[in-house]
Amino acid sequence: RAVGVATALVSDTGVEDYVAAIAADYQHVRDVREGKGQSALLSLADARANAFVADMSDKPMPPEQPGLHVFDDWDLADLAEVIDWTPFFRAWELAGNFPAILTDEVVGESATALWADAQAMLKRIIDEKWFTARGVVGLWPCRREGDDVIVHVPLHPEQMPAFAGEEWTARTHGVTASLPGDQFGLDGDFHHVRLPFLRQQIAKREGRANMCLADFIDHDGDWIGGFAVGIHGLEPHLERFRADKDDYSDILAKALADRFAEAFAERLHRHVRTTLWGYAPGEQLTNEALIREEYRGIRPAPGYPACPEHSLKQILFDLLDAGNSAGLTLTENFAMLPTAAVSGFYFGHPDSQYFGVARVGEEQLQDYAVRRGVDTDTARRWLRPNLD
């Protein structure tokens, strides 16, 4: 698509028609949006009164191995086994599910040629070790406080044997003071870090809850996890392709790095469920079942529908010490570097599920700013895509 766009923009004869077509498309989008109107919003109090109620008698057990776990060089061949190829083809604007897309009457020939090229490069990536897969997992005690989850991070690593690094610094994330853990049924001294989540406010049909991720955490004590993974080593190969003016290989390598990052997130989540947290030790799922998410628990990512506010990545990265643990950093707008990276939270309750927060109102915006510890203008900028 990028090649076609660039060609149209540099064309002496086609650029005006192309720009006019784009303008017409966007005007159509505006007209449709204005015609549809917007769904009614509940007050924040009413939305909270209609919260999802999870059965806390079925909450997950404490982790077998709490704390931080660092993975410096996960086997690329292992990750290749769980790659979900359907999004790979969509990235090339080839519509269809893998492997059926390879025999599709319309795009099958193009998809098959692309698949062959991808497999050839994939083999080189693994054999020549182009990439290094680095990641970190954290599993912490926590509790729910309204629409927030308060994460308890030990002040001293020896309180949680798997916890890595020196004394952890809470920074400024709407954190309470460092308090004795016994206030929350914990041994030792802990930082208490606030994770503010957003609640659905759009009026629902009877029997449908206005959900928030905090609904899956017990007020009386629970556990939450976090992770961040990244694929390192891509850039030198991109430089080589650019020097050779090989745009195709450049794009192909980027697409495969993204697939490795997603596969790493999938593989690590399974390791958490079966071993580190261990609430599903006997899990035996096929790759297809993993893609369909037929497992217990979710891993919502900041910036995605259930957790749309990107700045929570900064709290997550600080909790994980992601820079030192996995070589991952954030830009000022909370984009992850390297770009082939995935991060998110782990919820283990069997009732936990994905949903979209969608539109929220001014009342929740102001409430969120207080809970997040920022001024309203900053919160408004962060939440703009979800505002009324």
Regions found by a protein language model. Name each.
Residues 3-251, 255, 274-276, 285:
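Active-site loops and adjacent core secondary-structure elements that bind or stabilize anionic groups
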Residues 168, 186, 205-388:
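C-terminal accessory domains/tails appended to large, multi-domain proteins
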